[in-house]
Amino acid sequence: DNYCINPGLNHGAVPQGIAVDEDRDIVLTTAYMKDKSASRIYLTNSKNEQKIVSLTKNGKAFTGHVGGISLSGDYAYISDGDRIYKIELSKIQTEDFIEIGEGIKVNNQASFTFADDEYLYVGEFNYADKYICENIIGDYKAICTKYSLDDLTTPVATYSIRDKVQGFCVTDKGDIVLSTSWAVAD
């Protein structure tokens, strides 16, 4: 019965994304901080070993929402605003501060991510009338875009999804699973 505890929960962290690699016994969680200090990546494992990585951008504390994190190969992909930040896993494992750079601009607000061995999916939470797509089920108001891990600048496909999505995955059978929620009280 192995489990891990996110070390930031009692220190003002607001967890956003989670990525798990069972083969390497790695759990990564992104969080922004209530006190507006640097956003973080928490690295934990099944032995409850913990490491905190603070994010910087242009030498200053990066305080973005860091809504999603995914792992594929030797890289972690973090979504924030309209950008994806690609970070070497080895840096997360060894450094206390990581400069995230300018990131790669994507075609949506990059609220969440999912990665497999070939693709990175980047989607947005949107609840406004931004990307309205009408179908027999109703109106969808958000998108999720698929990128090749070899080229994060050119969309491979764009999916119309319901609004208020906070998590996304593609199963081994090719099914798309969406997770929705919003406005949990403090």
PLM regions: where:
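Short coil/turn segments that connect the beta-strands within blades of beta-propeller domains
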Residues: 23-25, 73-74, 117-118, 173-175
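Beta-strand-rich domains and repeat architectures in extracellular enzymes and scaffolds
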Residues: 3-37
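Repeated scaffold domains used in trafficking and secretory/extracellular systems
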Residues: 12-19, 61-68, 105-117, 162-170
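Blade-loop segments of beta-propeller domains
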Residues: 14, 48-74
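A short beta-strand motif characteristic of beta-propeller blades
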Residues: 2-10, 50-59, 95-104, 153-159
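Short, conserved, GDST-rich strand-edge loop motifs in beta-rich repeat architectures
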Residues: 28-35, 123-140, 181-186
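Loop/turn-rich, solvent-exposed surfaces of beta-rich toroidal or solenoidal domains
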Residues: 158-186
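Beta-propeller blade signature
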Residues: 39-47, 135-150, 186
